[in-house]
UniProtKB/Swiss-Prot annotation:
Source taxon at top rank: Bacteria
Reaction(s) catalysed (UniProt annotation): ATP + (deoxyribonucleotide)n-3'-hydroxyl + 5'-phospho-(deoxyribonucleotide)m = (deoxyribonucleotide)n+m + AMP + diphosphate
Pfam families listed in its UniProt record: DNA_ligase_A_C (PF04679), DNA_ligase_A_M (PF01068)
Entry annotation: catalytic residues: K29
Protein name, UniProt field: DNA ligase C
Function: DNA ligase that seals nicks in double-stranded DNA during DNA replication, DNA recombination and DNA repair.
Enzyme Commission code: 6.5.1.1
Family: Belongs to the ATP-dependent DNA ligase family.
Length: 358
């Protein structure tokens, strides 16, 4: 492989801001695996955020890249799995598997797509020193997937310079599993590993029941994370996520403070967790290739404490990302902490965002 920009390359990053900034090019924020695609003839490499190749996990994308992208190019984008119900990040995580037979099976069962949003090289030309406005125009010209062909696996992300349109995308596209809006100043060059773009994500709060804790990796004298629950319509307490960003002094204080609430699994709403795969974990599918060797066992607590947390969005019945501590809510009845309090976005079809994407 001999390209003007050679792997590995760390992708250009975005800093979080609270509002959509003016005078930028706006794109939907896709929720998948960030990947820089390198193609030199039949040679294809899919890089990752940590610069480790993901090529072997997505054979269907390698074939699509050879069929749909220019003969020699380097393109920044996102690997996603699109379904009739929106993006499926959990299915995407399952694609990272050591067994080639399973990789092939999942490539057929849950094929991935590639959303292109920046151009680093084309032919013999290095585009990283050119302004984004020029890179974007060349990207649209270069990628065949910018059309509405449902048989294509490579697509160019939509973009606009209109703030009102960007605000509408921010409000509506969450219903398809997207993650907010990215704003790119039109003059910026491609700057690997630099936060020169802007990301605007949703921010919400929820009152959750503290149902357990995990000890800190440094030892058993501190809390690692608190396990959160919400009550379902049938009265069962469901696992909804975790919070874990506490100063070490607070982690130790919490461990002492929560000891009176420690209970046995027999008396806990997640009493089945002690018997699943020999591990005490509130999620049957919590183990994955991403956390091999990580202890996910937990100490059960009587569900009597309520905490207000910040979160961006839901994926199914759980917080998509780790929630953030806001404050304790001693005034709240734990039984009142249900899914009914959560804002539910309107459902949007992915094909309404990118024609041909399903």
């Amino acid at each position: 492989m001999q390209l003007p920009v050679m792997p590995p390359v760390s992708p250009m990053l975005a800093k979080s801001v609270t509002a959509i900034p003016p005078d930028a090019s706006y794109e939907p924020k896709w929720d998948g695996f960030r990947s820089i695609c390198f193609r030199d003839g039949d040679q294809v490499e899919l890089g990752s955020r940590n610069e480790r190749p993901m090529t072997r996990y997505f054979p269907e994308l390698v074939a699509a890249i050879r069929a749909e992208l220019p003969h020699r190019c380097v393109i920044d984008g996102e690997i996603i799995i699109a379904t009739d119900h929106g993006l499926d990040f959990e299915a995407l995580q399952q694609r990272i598997h050591p067994a080639e037979s399973r990789v092939r099976m999942l490539a057929d069962r849950t094929p991935a797509s590639f959303i292109a949003f920046d151009l680093l090289a084309l032919g013999d030309d290095d585009y990283t020193g050119r302004p984004f406005s020029e890179r974007r125009a060349a990207l649209v010209d270069a990628v065949t997937g910018s059309g509405a062909d449902a048989d294509l696996s490579i697509h160019v992300t939509p973009a606009t310079t209109d703030m009102a349109t960007a605000q509408r995308w921010f409000s509506e596209f969450e219903g398809a599993g997207l993650d907010g809006v990215i704003a790119k100043p039109p003059h910026i060059t491609y700057q690997p590993d630099k936060r020169v773009m802007f990301k605007i994500k949703h921010l919400r709060t929820a009152d959750c029941v503290v149902a357990g804790y995990r000890v800190h990796k440094s030892g058993s004298d501190a809390i690692g994370s608190l396990l959160l629950g919400l009550y379902q319509e049938d009265g069962q307490l469901a696992s909804v996520g975790v919070i874990g960003a506490f100063p070490m002094a607070e982690r130790r204080r919490l461990l002492t403070e929560l000891q009176p609430l420690v209970t046995s699994f027999d008396d806990h709403p997640w009493n089945w967790a002690a018997h699943v795969a020999g591990q005490r974990t509130p999620r049957k599918n919590e183990f994955s290739r991403w956390n091999v060797g990580k202890d996910l066992s937990f100490v059960p607590l009587r569900p009597e404490r309520v905490v207000e947390v910040r979160y961006d969005r839901m994926e199914g019945a759980r917080f998509r990302h780790t929630a953030q501590f806001n404050r304790w809510r001693p005034d709240r009845d734990p039984r009142s902490c249900s899914y009914a309090q959560l804002e539910r976005p309107l459902t949007v079809s992915l094909s309404d965002i990118v024609p041909g994407l399903r």
